[in-house]
Curated annotation (Swiss-Prot):
Cofactor(s) it depends on: Mg(2+)
Organism: Deinococcus geothermalis (strain DSM 11300 / CIP 105573 / AG-3a)
PANTHER family: PHOSPHOPANTETHEINE ADENYLYLTRANSFERASE
Biological pathway: Cofactor biosynthesis; coenzyme A biosynthesis; CoA from (R)-pantothenate: step 4/5
Subunit structure: Homohexamer.
Protein family according to the UniProt entry: Belongs to the bacterial CoaD family.
Name of the molecule in the record: Phosphopantetheine adenylyltransferase
InterPro entries cross-referenced by the UniProt entry: Cyt_trans-like (IPR004821), PPAT (IPR001980), Rossmann-like_a/b/a_fold (IPR014729)
Binding-site residues for substrate, renumbered to this chain: S8, K40, L74, R88
Function: Reversibly transfers an adenylyl group from ATP to 4'-phosphopantetheine, yielding dephospho-CoA (dPCoA) and pyrophosphate.
Any Gene Ontology CC annotation: cytoplasm
GO biological process: coenzyme A biosynthetic process
UniProt catalytic activity: (R)-4'-phosphopantetheine + ATP + H(+) = 3'-dephospho-CoA + diphosphate
Main location: cytoplasm
Amino acid sequence: MNAVFPGSFDPITSGHMDVLTRASRIFEHVTVTVMHNARKQGRHLFSLEERLEILREATAHLPNVSVDSFSGLLVDYMRQQQKGIIVRGLRAVSDYEYELQIAHLNRQIGEVETVFIMAATRWSFVSSTMVKEIASYGGDISEMVPRASAAALKRKFAQQYAAREAELSSAGERGAQQAAESKT
């Protein structure tokens, strides 16, 4: 039996990897699907292509896992791929309440079943949002994300830091020039 593990994966975390690894032991094949929502364009740190590349690298050691993307309703993707099971990871009871509503809706409109896998307790606090916040301040995220995500975050924030530094340096030079001009 085959399953789909959907998400935005911006980026994939150790919690995602925990759920995915366990799902790969349960199902013959798992497709990790990056759901692309055009209305959320610009809200992600990583582009769709970057997220796909990070996922491919992070899942390379799992022979029965593939990576894909889709724009639209998940149930439409499931129909197209002829897959009937969605895997969702849960961190806390609050996740369950939301995911249960979505699971019922998916079953009603798409005849798709949802299998919930609880994330290991050590990952219950980890989210992509939290990881990005910590990484943006140079914090250690090595335990919270696979190596591919950590490297991508480091590169992304180094670029942003360099751009910020250049902007501040340019602003400082303009300020010094204006100060010198005002003295004359």
